[in-house]
Curated annotation (Swiss-Prot):
It comes from Mus musculus. Residues 204-215 have a biased composition (Gly residues). Acetylated at Lys-165 by KAT5; acetylation is required for its subsequent phosphorylation. Deacetylated by SIRT2. InterPro entries: MARCKS. Induction: By lipopolysaccharides (LPS). This is Myristoylated alanine-rich C-kinase substrate. GO terms for molecular function: actin filament binding; calmodulin binding; identical protein binding; protein kinase C binding. Membrane-associated protein that plays a role in the structural modulation of the actin cytoskeleton, chemotaxis, motility, cell adhesion, phagocytosis, and exocytosis through lipid sequestering and/or protein docking to membranes. Thus, exerts an influence on a plethora of physiological processes, such as embryonic development, tissue regeneration, neuronal plasticity, and inflammation. Sequesters phosphatidylinositol 4,5-bisphosphate (PIP2) at lipid rafts in the plasma membrane of quiescent cells, an action reversed by protein kinase C, ultimately inhibiting exocytosis. Its main location: membrane. It is a lipid-anchor. The lineage of its organism: Eukaryota, Metazoa, Chordata, Craniata, Vertebrata. The gene is Marcks. Disruption phenotype: Most of deletion mutant embryos display an abnormal brain development with defects including open cranial neural tubes (exencephaly), open spinal neural tubes (spina bifida) and tail flexion, and the pups die within several hours after birth. Transmembrane segments: none annotated. Coiled coil: none annotated. PANTHER family: MYRISTOYLATED ALANINE-RICH C-KINASE SUBSTRATE, MYRISTOYLATED ALANINE-RICH C-KINASE SUBSTRATE MARCKS.
Length: 309
């Protein structure tokens, strides 16, 4: 029992000599497995760290014990010791110290904020012309883009319009050309019909001789006459030479052509002697196409047709 008391007494002396260590030993930091010496190195934020003894022992530079020795010597030395104690408290409480540091940094930042604002304003004022210069070309760069888009759109629209107009012009020209060809064909058909009409009185004048030479009936010749203008009108619309295609027989296609031209010339000049020959040839060519009966009669008409020319 005496040994135990001695141990407890020794412990009490130790606690009296080093209350900070006893407080640290009784601190719940041991639950983490940290010893007293480790607390100095790690600087663990324990509730005992707030005590002045712990603060003094936690100093690693040894300024705290020196301050304790020099307390009766001078009060001025206590001020740096207090400052160091404050630093030790900040070190022991890293979270609070960080918050204090942030607050301290924020405090000088606040007075410097007007200066920063002034500097920012001056920088903005100095950079404002540059920014304005940079902003000035930016709208100019945007406007040409818009102009380019507009011009491109207008160009495309104009091109489409021109192409559409060109197509209209081309279609109009094609229609005019077709109309001109149709008018020319109509004129040729009218001229051919006029020549045949002019040749009709010639046929009436010399119809007896022509019918006697052909040996055909007058009714067949009269029926062939209305068929003649129909045949030349159709080929006239297709080709300029309507009279050459009006004849059904391919062998006699070349022979009546000069006769037809002679008939046109006779209608223009006025001689009635050549007109009966051309009309006889046309009637002879149209007769076989109109009815199959006069086909054998066409054979004797073939030799006198060139002789009449």
């Amino acid at each position: 029992m005496g040994a135990q008391f001695s141990k407890t007494a020794a412990k009490g002396e130790a606690t009296a000599e080093r209350p900070g260590e006893a407080a640290v030993a009784s601190s719940p930091s041991k639950a983490n497995g940290q010893e007293n010496g480790h607390v100095k190195v790690n600087g663990d934020a324990s509730p005992a760290a707030a005590e002045p003894g712990a603060k003094e022992e936690l100093q690693a530079n040894g300024s705290a014990p020196a301050a304790d020795k020099e307390e009766p010597a001078s009060g001025s030395a206590a001020t740096p010791a207090a400052a160091e104690k404050d630093e030790a408290a900040a070190a022991t409480e890293p979270g609070a110290g960080a918050a204090d540091k942030e607050a301290a940094e924020a405090e000088p930042a606040e007075p410097s904020s007007p200066a920063a604002e002034a500097e920012g304003a001056s920088a903005s004022s100095t950079s404002s012309p540059k920014a304005e210069d940079g902003a000035a070309p930016s709208p100019s760069s945007e406007t040409p883009k818009k102009k380019k888009k507009r011009f491109s759109f207008k160009k495309s629209f104009k091109l489409s319009g021109f192409s559409f107009k060109k197509s209209k012009k081309e279609s109009g020209e094609g229609a005019e050309a077709e109309g001109a060809t149709a008018e020319g064909a109509k004129d040729e058909a009218a001229a051919a019909a006029g020549g045949e009409g002019a040749a009709a009185p010639g046929e009436q004048a010399g119809g007896a001789g022509a019918e006697g030479a052909a040996g055909g009936e007058p009714r067949e010749a009269e029926a062939a006459e209305p068929e003649q203008p129909e045949q030349p009108e159709q080929p006239a619309a297709e080709e300029p030479q309507a009279e050459e295609q009006s004849e059904a027989a391919g062998e006699k296609a070349e022979e009546p052509a000069p006769g037809a031209t002679a008939g046109d010339a006779s209608s223009a000049a006025g001689p009635e002697q050549e007109a009966p020959a051309a009309t006889d040839e046309a009637a002879a060519s149209a007769a076989p196409a109109a009815s199959p009966e006069p086909q054998p009669e066409c054979s004797p008409e073939a030799p006198p047709a060139p002789t009449a020319e």
